[in-house]
């Protein structure tokens, strides 16, 4: 009898360990996009000296989607930025696509008279129209034989001076790779030619703790209505990594680090990162239920 009880307990431990290992493994679907800001893709042409870059990761979290992003801009009054939006997919010089999200930024965002550097994250609820749309669009836009060969997600930046309807800069986001998905299609340049940048790493731990993330399907409110606290960058077609370095890990959710020793700039891919903490928290109730169920079966036997 004692042997049977010991064997039962041993089986329970194996079952729980296996369940825990599957539940907490880092198997989140992640799609990575990168782009540079400029004026050439704007619907209404503008001339300015804004330079910068953008990183975006779309991850599957708890049945919905989480957008983690960062932008770095120079040549713009960061305190004048009124609104940053994620839109598309659409070809350059056109407005289109059903995705329309206003992006909030976290407290580490740097706003000065010459630059805007910041990042954040936003969640889209499961079973929402936006969530369904994103799911299908990701399949289409990341396929090598995609109908979206000339269309991408894009980010626009508006200022108080120019107005919300007149973005001063735009970044077409090129698909660079994915992880834990059956789809490993290639990205496409805005001109339609195939040119896939190197795949970047996973979401950093700072992205999963952003206090400004939203769990609703609608877009969050724009950054503050006062020029002193609202984030908004302008752009040109080249990135300026040398002047945009800060100590914040949220600047590059794609895991890209830049170093500027003298006049040289290098990039290295980060291979570390942590899974969104919400995934672990959401699985705990299930783990407890499974434990109780298995114990009940043992007692009844």
From Swiss-Prot:
Extracellular-side segments: 26-279
GO cellular component terms, A-Z: membrane
Keywords for the protein's UniProt record, in alphabetical order: Glycoprotein, Membrane, Signal, Transmembrane, Transmembrane helix
Segments of this protein annotated with the region Disordered: 174-281
Bias (Low complexity) ranges: 204-234, 254-281
Signal peptide: 1-25
Superkingdom of the organism of origin: Eukaryota
Residues bearing carbohydrate: 191, 212, 234, 241
Residues on Cytoplasmic side: 301
The keyword Lyase is assigned to this record: no
The keyword Glycoprotein appears for this protein: yes
Compartments in which it is found: Membrane
Membrane topology: Single-pass type I membrane protein
Main location: membrane
Transmembrane segments: 280-300
Protein name, as recorded: Uncharacterized transmembrane protein DDB_G0282061
Organism: Dictyostelium discoideum (Social amoeba)
């Amino acid at each position: 009898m004692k042997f049977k009880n010991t064997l039962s307990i041993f089986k329970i431990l194996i079952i729980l360990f296996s369940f825990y290992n599957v539940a907490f493994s880092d198997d989140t679907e992640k799609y990575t996009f990168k782009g540079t800001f400029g004026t050439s893709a704007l619907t209404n042409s503008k001339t300015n000296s804004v330079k910068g870059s953008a990183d975006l990761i779309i991850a599957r979290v708890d049945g919905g989607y989480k957008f983690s992003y960062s932008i770095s801009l120079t040549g713009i009054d960061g305190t004048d930025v009124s609104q940053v939006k994620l839109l598309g997919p659409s070809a350059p010089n056109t407005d289109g696509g059903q995705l329309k999200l206003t992006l909030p930024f976290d407290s580490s965002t740097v706003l000065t008279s010459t630059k805007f550097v910041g990042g954040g994250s936003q969640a889209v609820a499961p079973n929402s129209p936006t969530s369904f749309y994103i799911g299908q669009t990701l399949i289409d836009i990341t396929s090598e034989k995609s109908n979206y060969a000339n269309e991408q997600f894009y980010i626009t930046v508006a200022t108080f001076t120019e107005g919300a309807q007149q973005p001063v800069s735009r970044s077409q986001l090129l698909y660079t790779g994915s992880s834990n998905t059956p789809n490993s299609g290639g990205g496409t340049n805005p001109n339609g030619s195939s040119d896939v940048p190197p795949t970047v790493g996973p979401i950093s731990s700072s992205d999963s703790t952003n206090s400004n993330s939203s769990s609703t399907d609608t877009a969050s409110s724009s950054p503050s209505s006062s020029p002193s606290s609202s984030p908004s960058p302008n752009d040109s077609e080249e990135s300026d990594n040398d002047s945009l370095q800060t100590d914040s890990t949220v600047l590059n959710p794609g895991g890209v680090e830049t170093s500027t020793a003298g006049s040289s700039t290098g990039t290295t891919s980060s291979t570390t990162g942590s899974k969104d903490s919400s995934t672990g928290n959401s699985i705990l109730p299930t783990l407890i239920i499974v434990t109780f169920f298995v114990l009940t079966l043992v007692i009844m036997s």
